[in-house]
């Protein structure tokens, strides 16, 4: 089993979402020691600006126009990034909530790699995702708890966004574990985190290779 872990918090070992993902991976690899993990840290990877040559390459591809050498080089890098998704059996996101959404570097990664011929295609029925048969697991942290003041259906642009992306690339359902109210009083934050850790272990134990 091969896991692609997309780490999107810049806080390192202090990150709640990363701690949850680490618990999941520790449990999973202890049960399936043959598993391999590819860590894609959005804060350390060299993401190309998606403008200029990258944008022109995108439209050249869509329109069937010959790319320049510069555009071909950029497009080759995007395909290489996409291969990391294709090689994975499990795509794992550890993601904090920033302003009700995801960190901008994660959005940059997704915008770069989600291209025709990389993660999806068009056919007679419309868009067809190319990552069918894979699992997506999201470990999400939130400083506040969504609820009465901030209804989930209106304010969740974190897990809901990743669900939408997963459907676009051919993965109809995802598993998500939340640790909310990380900025609340210590007792509340710790209780939520402890429950989320247990859920992460349980989710990993249920994985079938």
Swiss-Prot record:
Coiled-coil intervals, chain numbering: none
Catalytic activity: 2 a quinone + NADH + H(+) = 2 a 1,4-benzosemiquinone + NAD(+); N,N-dimethyl-1,4-phenylenediamine + anthranilate + 2 NAD(+) = 2-(4-dimethylaminophenyl)diazenylbenzoate + 2 NADH + 2 H(+)
Keywords linked to the UniProt accession: Flavoprotein, FMN, NAD, Oxidoreductase
Gene3D superfamilies referenced in this protein's UniProt entry, alphabetically: 3.40.50.360
Binding site for FMN: 9, 15-17, 97-100
Enzyme class of the recorded protein, top EC level: oxidoreductase
Cofactor note: Binds 1 FMN per subunit.
Family per record: Belongs to the azoreductase type 1 family.
PANTHER family associated with the record: FMN-DEPENDENT NADH-AZOREDUCTASE 1, FMN-DEPENDENT NADH:QUINONE OXIDOREDUCTASE
Name recorded for this polypeptide: FMN-dependent NADH:quinone oxidoreductase 2
Source organism of the structure: Pseudomonas syringae pv. tomato (strain ATCC BAA-871 / DC3000)
Lineage, top ranks: Bacteria, Pseudomonadati, Pseudomonadota, Gammaproteobacteria, Pseudomonadales
């Amino acid at each position: 089993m091969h896991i692609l872990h997309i780490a999107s918090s810049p806080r390192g070992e202090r990150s709640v979402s990363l701690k949850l993902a680490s618990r999941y991976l520790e449990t999973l690899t202890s049960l399936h020691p043959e598993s391999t993990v590819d860590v894609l840290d959005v804060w350390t990877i060299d993401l190309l600006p998606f403008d200029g040559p990258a944008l022109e390459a995108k439209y050249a591809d869509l329109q069937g126009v010959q790319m320049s050498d510069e555009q071909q080089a950029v497009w080759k890098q995007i395909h290489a990034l996409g291969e990391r998704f294709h090689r994975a059996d499990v795509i794992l996101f550890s993601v904090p909530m920033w302003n009700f959404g995801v960190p901008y570097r994660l959005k940059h990664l997704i915008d770069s790699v989600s291209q025709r011929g990389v993660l999806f295609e068009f056919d007679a029925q419309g868009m067809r995702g190319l990552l069918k048969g894979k699992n997506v697991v999201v470990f999400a942290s939130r400083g506040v708890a969504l609820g009465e003041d901030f209804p989930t259906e209106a304010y969740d642009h974190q897990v809901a966004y990743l669900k939408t992306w997963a459907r676009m690339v051919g993965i109809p359902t995802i598993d998500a574990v939340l640790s909310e109210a990380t900025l609340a009083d210590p007792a509340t934050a710790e209780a939520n985190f402890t429950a989320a850790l247990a859920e992460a272990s349980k989710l990993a134990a249920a994985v079938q290779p």
